[in-house]
Amino acid sequence: MASQQLDGKYISLIWSKGMRKRKCLIAGNWKMNGTLESLSEIVKIDKASVQLDSDLVLCVPNTIIHAASEKITSTKLLIGAQNCHQEENGAFTGDISAKMLKNVGAKIIIVGHSERRFECGETSSLVEKKAAASIRMGLPTIICIGETEEQKIKGETETVVCSQLERSMPDASNDLNTIIAYEPVWAIGTGKVPTLEDIAHVHRRIRNVLKQEKGKDISQKMRILYGGSVKPDNAKEIFSLEDVDGALVGGASLKADDFINIAKKAQTRCS
């Protein structure tokens, strides 16, 4: 992945072909899966990445971040974390800061995943603080947003998604340090996927909110990922949508072959 120094910090570039278009990002979220024995899958993905045009990310458990980072030889694959504390240090038993994650090799951090929002009670206000902490450490940050099935049935998708986006983005967010991931909660791990029209509509709405919050230039450059039961057999159609710039992949990222096949589906979009 190309990079540059901005205020002495690592920042991921998102442009290809002479800075003309958003470059695809395929991010894997391993959740609470993976041990040292799983590093062989990461090695396979690392080797395959040199043949791919997309940027690749694997957010693995904290326990294997360092070991995974040591295995990476490609510049197209980053190892990341799935969460961080909003403070740099202190009396927060069991938590880990962005500074600590960076110290062991994390190059990017996910914040605001629905499993953190709903199972751990994290609010958008807290997500914003976590994103700000990650960005302060010079780590590109994936901010997750998405509605529940109940909210979808009530017709609240746009209201929920836009509110989460507005409240979860720190002032420091821009196209170089922030990636948005739209993950309808009801689609995560269920096999259910919104229609292409629905995905396109929500991503377009997110792009419009980014324009209002960050201005036209940043809104056109910031990547928006789709997440929720993304698999090799549906990825190509999803990636064909104008405002979809990649995917946040769950279970399918645990197996190198599946993850690589998803990334290959983005080739036509990235080339």
Can you describe what each PLM-predicted range is?
Residues 5-6, 10:
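Cationic, low-complexity basic patches in intrinsically disordered or flexible, solvent-exposed regions
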Residues 11-271:
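Active-site loop-to-helix "anion-binding N-cap" substructures in soluble metabolic enzymes
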